[in-house]
Design a protein with these regions (language model features):
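Amphipathic alpha-helical repeat scaffolds
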Residues: 34, 54-58
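Local sequence-structure signature of Cys/Sec-based thiol-disulfide redox active-site neighborhoods
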Residues: 46-51
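Bacterial Sec-dependent N-terminal signal peptides
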Residues: 1-25
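N-terminal "domain-start" segment that seeds a small globular fold
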Residues: 22-43, 126
């Protein structure tokens, strides 16, 4: 019993020691490009509640923009922000330029939350 407890405590201790190593990269250390190719530092959003979304304008989930906008409007005065990152890597479902995507979202769903330049989200081997 005591031997098992020591082993368990050792595992927990090692896991806790690894947390700072795993947490060194946080969202505030990243910079991204907006639709005008300007660099935006995510540390500018520090203190806000962020919902970072990967979106597409030509897929079955495109109507999510309506719900995202409603969430944003409801909670933005309490520090909530939706950060929208379109991606064309999944079946080419986010075609067009940033301007095309932005115009589509604003005219069809009235989006006002920050929308960034298209990103690639797949890893090297995906």
């Amino acid at each position: 019993m005591i031997k098992g407890m020591k082993k368990l405590l050792s595992i927990i201790f090692l896991a806790l020691m690894a947390l700072p190593i795993m947490a060194q990269k946080n969202v505030y250390k990243f910079s991204v490009k907006d639709g005008n190719d300007h660099t935006v530092k995510l540390k500018d959003y520090k203190g806000k509640v962020l919902l970072i979304v990967n979106t597409a304008t030509k897929c079955g989930f495109t109507p999510q923009y309506e719900a995202l906008q409603k969430l944003y409007e409801t909670y933005k005065n309490q520090g909530f922000v939706v950060l929208d990152f379109p991606c064309n890597q999944f079946g080419a479902q986010a075609p067009g330029s940033f301007r095309d995507i932005h115009a589509f979202c604003t005219s069809n769903y009235g989006t006002t939350f920050p929308q960034f330049a298209k990103v690639n989200v797949n890893g090297r081997n995906e």
